[in-house]
Curated annotation (Swiss-Prot):
Transmembrane segments: none annotated. It is found in: Cytoplasm. The lineage of its organism: Archaea, Methanobacteriati, Methanobacteriota, Methanomada group, Methanococci. The active site is at C128 (nucleophile). It comes from Methanocaldococcus jannaschii (strain ATCC 43067 / DSM 2661 / JAL-1 / JCM 10045 / NBRC 100440). PROSITE patterns: MGMT. This enzyme catalyzes only one turnover and therefore is not strictly catalytic. According to one definition, an enzyme is a biocatalyst that acts repeatedly and over many reaction cycles. GO terms for biological process: DNA alkylation repair; DNA repair; methylation. It comes from the Archaea. Pfam families: DNA_binding_1, OGT_N. It is an enzyme of class 2 (transferase). This is Methylated-DNA--protein-cysteine methyltransferase. It catalyses: a 6-O-methyl-2'-deoxyguanosine in DNA + L-cysteinyl-[protein] = S-methyl-L-cysteinyl-[protein] + a 2'-deoxyguanosine in DNA; a 4-O-methyl-thymidine in DNA + L-cysteinyl-[protein] = a thymidine in DNA + S-methyl-L-cysteinyl-[protein]. Its EC number is 2.1.1.63.
Length: 167
């Protein structure tokens, strides 16, 4: 399903009441490159709540650790990808790790870490955008401009960040 909030579109797939896949908030012209489906005109309250939380993550208005307490989700990924994403979940708001940092922890290559991150079905909720290359931003499925935007928002909000109560 795709839910529109203001000018943003957020794709989500649920199994039962658990979120198993989402997109970051995108413009109408971008969303269908990342998710098939129709825009739901009257989403269920629970689905709308999840979309609103994802939008807050995009603008760095809430910490992903808090979100993982608010949203029921399930990771359906291969074991290695899960190990990578478990490390990524621990990267603090406003901070980054390199692909190499994670690779050392798992005794693997930075390229393998990058491939695992590309499989992250829950971007923003599991903050793969916080993983960068040694001397650059690295890659991001949604484009480096969006990765840079999210990281800049997090750094700006980190100094005076007060976690707003969400629902």
């Amino acid at each position: 399903m795709i839910i529109q909030i203001e000018e943003y579109f957020i794709g989500m797939i649920f199994k039962g009441n658990q979120l198993v896949r989402n997109t970051i908030p995108l413009r109408r012209e971008e969303i269908f490159n990342f998710m098939d489906g129709e825009v739901v005109s009257n989403p269920e309250d629970e689905h709308l709540k999840v979309a609103e939380i994802i939008l807050k993550l995009y603008f760095a208005e809430i910490d992903d650790k808090k979100v993982r307490e608010l949203i029921s989700y399930k990771l359906e990924v291969p074991e290695f990808t899960k190990k990578v994403l478990d490390i990524v979940k621990d990267i603090e708001f406003g901070k980054t790790l390199t692909y190499g940092d994670i690779a050392k922890k798992l005794n693997t290559s930075p390229r393998a870490v990058g491939m695992a991150l590309k499989r992250n079905p829950l971007p923003l909720i599991i903050p793969c955008h916080r993983v960068v290359a040694k001397n650059s931003l690295g890659g991001y499925s949604y484009g480096l401009d969006k990765k840079k935007f999210i990281l800049e928002r997090e750094r700006l909000n980190m100094v005076s960040f007060k976690f707003n109560k969400v629902y």
